[in-house]
Regions:
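Small-residue-enriched hydrophobic alpha-helices in membranes
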Residues: 1-56, 63-179
């Protein structure tokens, strides 16, 4: 397990950060990335172990925790643990339509339980995914859970940059649809 000092520091920060509005958490993570890049490799390993323990300690993983894991994996881990870059496997959107549906459906469902509002948010972003000949469908809640989101994000990272850019734009439109 992580060192006592790091665990204590993390616990004290958690008490300060917990009351923050959900919308403030990702910008806070973004600010923390710069400081975390200055960790020594051994400290990064401790940080990763502590983060894993904190996320798993309540026996469930929520959407923010999944996103936090993905951010750390994508933006920090390569700096401390060199890995070969992922090889692009998807050059068109067609094979990624199910993954786009999962992602956009999950994002649409985050801010509302009202199906009409969820559908409106989904439709605000769907055209920006640029699936051309294939229409995107809003998925029911049970088809866009954390496991499905994780799998979709993993596959989407293997797409060419333009597809990623389009999906980012679509995601922003979905999230922004609730005002």
């Amino acid at each position: 397990r992580a060192g006592t000092s790091l665990a204590q520091q993390t616990a004290s920060l958690r008490r300060e950060v917990a009351p923050l509005a959900v919308r403030a958490r990702l910008p806070l993570v973004n600010l923390a990335l710069a400081a975390l890049r200055n960790l020594q490799p051994a400290d990064f390993q401790k940080f990763q172990a502590t983060l894993k323990w904190l996320i798993e300690s309540d026996g469930q993983i929520d959407l923010f925790e999944l996103v936090l894991q993905k951010i750390i994996q994508r933006h920090l881990k390569p700096q401390f643990i060199p890995a070969r870059p992922a090889v692009t496997q998807f050059y068109t959107m067609k094979p990624l339509v199910p993954d786009a549906e999962v992602l956009l459906s999950a994002l649409a469902r985050v801010s509302s339980a009202d199906e009409a509002e969820v559908a409106k948010a989904f439709q605000a972003g769907a055209p920006y995914a640029r699936t051309n000949e294939v229409a995107l469908n809003l998925l029911p809640q049970n088809q866009c859970g954390l496991q499905q989101i994780d799998a979709a994000l993993t596959r989407l990272t293997l797409a060419v940059p333009q597809i990623k850019k389009n999906l980012l734009e679509a995601s922003v439109r979905v999230v922004g649809a609730d005002g």
